[in-house]
């Protein structure tokens, strides 16, 4: 099975590059590393969980909502990181790509911290 954390490692390598393509790719790979960690936790918690193909990302982040403060934070910040990833992947003009990279890494670190708190041992 693929180790999704390898995307985070790649994102960290790309984040300090000067070209916008590397910065955008960094955000995208970071997002997928965090998304898959979150999704796999949900799937471990509930082996019968079926993530739909359509709107899978919304489903995953929404699934954390409403349970407790930690899970609500994961849900909220997951949606924030997804918004940044969508901007990086789909917007032709990003005014300050380096700020978007920094913001994305800050959000991701919060999510990963919270995910580590709830991750089944």
Language-model features: locations:
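Terminal alpha-helical segments
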Residues: 1-121
